[in-house]
Amino acid sequence: GEERLRVESVPQESAEAETEQEGKQEAKQFEAERNALTTTVTIDSGNLEAYLGKPKYMQDRIADRDEVGIVRGLAWTSVGGDTLQIEVNVMPGDGEIDLTGQMGDVMKESARIAMSYVRSVSERYQVAADIYTTRDFHIHIPEGAVPKDGPSAGVTMATAILSAVTGIPVHADVAMTGEVTLRGRVLPIGGLKEKILAAKTAGVKTVLVPKENAKDIAELEEEITEGLDIRLVESMEQVAEYALVRSA
């Protein structure tokens, strides 16, 4: 008899299901192989340097003791806020003022304004008038390789000079920022958020800020200002009251 070839077709749904199942199996196999090559690493303070290398920037910290002629200011940089230590030395001479630390023109002007202000209030602080003709003054900002400019270090320089000529130490845990005028007014500055963060990182307890920056302080998140005693000042008299260990 005649044989007939019988062909049975596989339903399309069944073929698609089989292909999907194969795909899932391949995905599981790939995931298993990937997991076998994956190592879980926990990074903490103990091994952070091993993975990221040495720190690029050293964290500045406040001094251990109150000192004469040394005041911590606050600065804004292109990579955030920073603290700025200003040092003033008084030595025998004839009234010369030496400015070092790569100060820009605006900062040099601020230093001269600060000096003029301190001279104008010398009698109030019982400073002998001839000190400005028989002594030289050296104002220095460390990290001399880094250029520095701007008027916001005015109050810091004025405080450092005042401390140096009176012999009154400055609280080590106080930092400040603000432009100063010849009459001792404290003018507003910019970059306040970054400066406050820098102060907090350095361990500063009290920050002196121009009163006209009050609105900027109000806009800061609580986690930034928490733990800081922020004082609003409008005159150098107030700055001296808060910064000097004993105000005259």
What function would you assign to each model-found segment?
Residues 14, 18-19, 27-48, 54-72, ...:
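Peripheral, non-AAA+ core regions of ATP-driven protein-machinery
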Residues 1-9, 74-79:
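AAA+ ATPase "lid" subdomain C-terminal helix
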